[in-house]
Amino acid sequence: MGAHLTHLARARPQPLTQHQRTQKDTMRLQKTVTVDKPLDAVFDYLSDFTTTTDWDPGTVTTVNQRGDGGVGTAYLNTSTFLGRQTQLTYIVRELVPGQRIRLQGENKTLTAVDTMTFRGVQAGTEVIYTAEFTFKGPARLLAPLLRPAFKRLGKQAQTGMHNALNQL
């Protein structure tokens, strides 16, 4: 019996590493939109992040604070989520014309990384939109509870993006 207890003591879970905590606290959504529109037109439209007001149902406003849309451009995004209004400052971190744009948004409770990857396909253009949300501080405890609401928002944004791109 003593040996069995010693084995249990050694099998105790170890604290999570910073990487493991970050993975656990990060929520990832990925949606694909395919439209019968030219790649250049789709890229030009979506790389202007102020257009989120057209297709993201949570966005109230997105204002270009500084920059020409390229790397380093800053956008102030005001969104409503579960009845609360919040602001994130997004910075364009990567922009490869016609291929990819990656933005990072921050506020005191959340870091969001939004990546849009573009590909010409027979039907027109395919956009793969990936959003990763990493919660900070006490908000980390709410992450698992918010997952269903974020998934709903992702589906609504996918539909909104599809509709907006079809208007181009």
Describe the function of each predicted region.
Residues 11-13:
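Compositionally biased, low-complexity flexible segments
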Residues 63-109, 126, 156-168:
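Glycine-rich portal/gate segments that line the openings of hydrophobic small-molecule binding cavities
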Residues 104-156:
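Beta-strand/loop substructures that line and gate deep hydrophobic ligand-binding cavities in soluble
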